[in-house]
Amino acid sequence: KDGRAMTEGDFAIDGVPGTGAKVTLKFVGPQGAASGKLLPTGNVKDTIVIDGKEYEYSFVDAANPVIFVHPEDFGVTGTETPAQFNALPDCEEICRKLEIIRGTGAITLGFAKDLEDAKKNSQTLPKIAFATKPVDYTAGSGKEIHAEDIDLVGRLFSVNMKMIDAYMGTGAICTVTAANTPGTIVNEIVCGDGKNPTNRVTHIRIGHPWGIMDAYADLKENEDGTHTVL
């Protein structure tokens, strides 16, 4: 305003105290930030067997590499707050399985030689996240989140399998990129069942533990009809 950066405003971000001036961050060409490839495994979906059970995941690398999994596969809804998740009687066992999948991703990226090395020396990357269809739930703030106001429910985990209270900006960029990648878990949630047959997603509303986060994407249409996030 008047040639100076604004420091006050009425813009609010769910999960961040107070209000302030709106700052829009743009990530240019986010694909392959860690691996040089949008899909580090070369597949839109992969499976892994843990204790005799098969788990499906999508590994997408954009702004930050994130592995998306179905919360239902782990016996949870994906709408849990961090406090609710930590209070689950089988929380430790769920986290053990999540770490195996995350560690496998670290090995794929070349960040670790085995699962133990990944747990010790590659704790921050890749991230892992629950992703599931929109449903009504109550956020940690007490705010009621309605299914019609979001495009998916997401829960990101940080170091030592700590569920994040909100949703990371780089995680949101990866999520909207995954939504534009046909066949990924995120894409099937956002665009499946005839909701968006073009698989073109310029705006996604992510329901997280403390509310809703918006992420936007500028797209280039490819010759095969797919879209690249610019």
Where are these regions (language model features)?
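Non-transmembrane, aqueous-exposed alpha-helical and coiled segments at domain scale
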Residues: 1-230
